């Protein structure tokens, strides 16, 4: 299959034309201002022209609406009259395996032409070409008008999709304040390095790409850090070892997810996700950097600095608990064996040794949350604590606990009521649509870091662990702009995939059906009031077709 050429776009600020040589072919590209592409207008136009009763051959209308929309956006980028173009014909090659298509295909036409395998092939190519996420122009464009894993809201009755979801183009994450989000974005590379160095089983990495006796390739494609990726030629950041692009729900076309770290083999020629025949499961990691623990280790008046020093000198579970409980709202919330957890924190415990004075339980659980609480209650987290860095060597290592182990098991697990758990549940749902036969193993990673001392500023820190040696010359490294790691917590998460799948699939399909009927009515009766239905909770609201969308 020919590569789509969709990520051959340089989005750096200075305008200039270049030639990128990829696979022996020359592909012209120019720099782009993605704001010139009216994504919202076209998506709504596609919805308005789609029949609610179209024949989808056992599939859903939403996926073909999404594909038709993406086709329009991608071919727009090919137009030499626009500010940006990708390789002419690349979109048709991706969708129809031909360089020509007489006209823009409507959803009904795509439904008659594309098989389920075709849909997966197209969407897996999109995922590959959108790695780099926020630094990738295609990722930014195609993410609009999607309900994303990080922005989907949940009520007591389940996931909530707003009645006018198709007008919403601002998919900025809304969890936490601006300072906390900035801290997370800044320190995510540090957490990624820790994940690579400590959390990924080396057995997951050195599996051969071929099982035949004559096979010579003895590593996953991602072991090579995707050094042949076209993205390296056009100014987008270097694609990391386990980076993931935009995964679009193959069931409804409505929901999207971009995983922080995804451990899955890729096709060495196309870069698309392609699990090895020997793989039985796929691990992925959601990273959360906790800004509220940031402290200056030399500030004698800061209680975090004091409990940190105690933990470093005497690494025990009691001292770890004291450090985590130093702040007013710690990242671990105790709720008691007979109580319910609140929605406050992503990590919870009911272990008596972690009881905290003044704790408050939460309201009654929904049936789904209670079910997931039961699935996760017996799961333990693992914790690593880091030594002060060796600046001369440029390395940082983990501390051995009193038990002699580098990781400590603690009775802390994921909170099914928290937004982080919901986000991971949605990610699991989206990924399961591509690989239904494989066991998905999601993890929540909690990163805690401290301010750098003056002599540590500007120094990259190699995470020096035995497992990290498998990366050879691409050793996981804490970038110089990141905080110094103090603690990393790895929490496995158990999601009832079949149950979540049914809920999200039904919610998505209902939202699409409601949108098709609503917008089709608007076209026929532009001045008539109508009821718009929230498919998640059954509520209705009066909208006028003449009202301008809230963009």
Curated annotation (Swiss-Prot):
> Keywords, A to Z?
Endonuclease, Exonuclease, Host cytoplasm, Host nucleus, Host-virus interaction, Hydrolase, Nuclease
- What is the similarity comment for this entry? Belongs to the herpesviridae alkaline nuclease family.
| HAMAP family in the record | HSV_AN (MF_04009)
Quote the subcellular location field of this record. Host nucleus; Host cytoplasm
Single GO cellular component annotation? host cell nucleus
Which E.C. number(s) belong to this protein? Answer: 3.1.-.-
**What is annotated about its quaternary structure and interactions?**
Interacts with major DNA-binding protein; this interaction increases the nuclease processivity of the alkaline exonuclease.
- Answer yes or no on keyword Nuclease: yes
The GO molecular function terms of this record are: DNA binding; endonuclease activity; exonuclease activity
Q: What is this protein called?
A: Alkaline nuclease
Q: What job does this protein perform?
A: Plays a role in processing non linear or branched viral DNA intermediates in order to promote the production of mature packaged unit-length linear progeny viral DNA molecules. Exhibits endonuclease and exonuclease activities and accepts both double-stranded and single-stranded DNA as substrate. Exonuclease digestion of DNA is in the 5'-> 3' direction and the products are 5'-monophosphate nucleosides. Additionally, forms a recombinase with the major DNA-binding protein, which displays strand exchange activity.
What domain of life does the native source organism fall in? Viruses
Which parts of the sequence are marked as the site Required for function? 188, 260, 286, 288
- To which species is this protein native? Varicella-zoster virus (strain Dumas)
Keyword 4Fe-4S, does the record have it? Answer: no
């Amino acid at each position: 299959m020919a590569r789509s050429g969709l990520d051959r776009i340089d989005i750096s600020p200075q305008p200039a034309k270049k030639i990128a040589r990829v696979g022996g072919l020359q592909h012209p590209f120019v720099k782009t201002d993605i704001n010139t592409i009216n994504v919202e207008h076209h998506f709504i136009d596609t919805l308005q022209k789609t029949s609610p009763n179209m024949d989808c051959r056992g599939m859903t209308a939403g996926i073909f609406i999404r594909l038709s929309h993406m086709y329009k956006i991608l071919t727009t980028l090919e137009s030499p009259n626009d500010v940006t173009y990708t390789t002419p014909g690349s979109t048709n090659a991706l969708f129809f395996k031909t360089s020509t298509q007489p006209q823009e295909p409507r959803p009904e036409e795509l439904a008659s032409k594309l098989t389920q395998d075709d849909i997966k092939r197209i969407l897996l190519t999109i995922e590959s070409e959108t790695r780099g996420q926020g630094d990738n122009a295609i990722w930014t464009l195609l993410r609009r008008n999607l309900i994303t894993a990080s922005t989907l809201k949940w009520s007591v009755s389940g996931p909530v999709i707003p009645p006018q979801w198709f007008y919403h183009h601002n998919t900025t994450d809304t969890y936490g304040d601006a300072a906390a989000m900035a801290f997370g974005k800044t320190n995510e590379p540090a957490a990624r390095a820790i994940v690579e160095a400590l959390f990924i089983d080396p057995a997951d990495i050195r599996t051969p790409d071929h099982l035949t006796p004559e096979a010579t390739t003895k590593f996953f494609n991602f072991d090579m850090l995707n050094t042949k990726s076209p993205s390296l030629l056009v100014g987008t950041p270097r694609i990391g070892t386990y980076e993931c692009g935009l995964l679009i729900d193959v069931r409804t076309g409505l929901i999207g997810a971009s995983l922080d770290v995804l451990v899955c083999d890729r096709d060495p020629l196309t870069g698309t996700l392609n699990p090895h025949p020997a793989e039985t499961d796929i691990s992925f990691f959601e990273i959360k950097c906790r800004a509220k623990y940031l402290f200056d280790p030399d500030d004698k008046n800061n209680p975090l600095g004091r409990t940190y020093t105690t933990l470093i000198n005497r690494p025990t579970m009691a001292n770890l608990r004291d450090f985590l409980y130093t702040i007013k709202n710690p990242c671990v919330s105790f709720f008691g064996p007979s109580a319910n957890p609140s929605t406050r924190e992503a990590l919870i415990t009911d272990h008596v040794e972690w009881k905290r004075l003044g704790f408050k339980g939460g309201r009654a659980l929904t049936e789904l949350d209670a079910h997931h609480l039961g699935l996760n209650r017996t799961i333990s987290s693992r914790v690593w604590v880091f030594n002060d860095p060796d600046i001369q060597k440029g390395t940082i290592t983990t501390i051995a606990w009193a038990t002699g182990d580098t990781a400590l098991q603690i009775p802390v697990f994921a909170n099914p009521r928290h937004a982080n758990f919901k986000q991971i549940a949605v990610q699991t749902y989206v990924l399961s649509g591509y690989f239904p036969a494989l066991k998905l193993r999601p993890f929540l990673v909690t990163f805690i870091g401290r301010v750098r001392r003056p002599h540590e500023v500007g120094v990259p820190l190699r995470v020096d662990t035995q497992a990290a040696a498998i990366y050879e010359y691409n050793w996981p490294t804490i970038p110089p702009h990141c905080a110094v790691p103090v603690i990393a917590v790895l929490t496995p998460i158990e999601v009832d995939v079949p149950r979540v799948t049914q809920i999200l699939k039904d919610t998505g399909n209902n939202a699409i059906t409601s949108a098709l009927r609503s917008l089709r009515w608007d076209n026929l009766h532009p001045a008539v009031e109508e009821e718009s239905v929230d498919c998640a909770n059954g509520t209705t609201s009066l909208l006028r077709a003449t009202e301008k969308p809230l963009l």
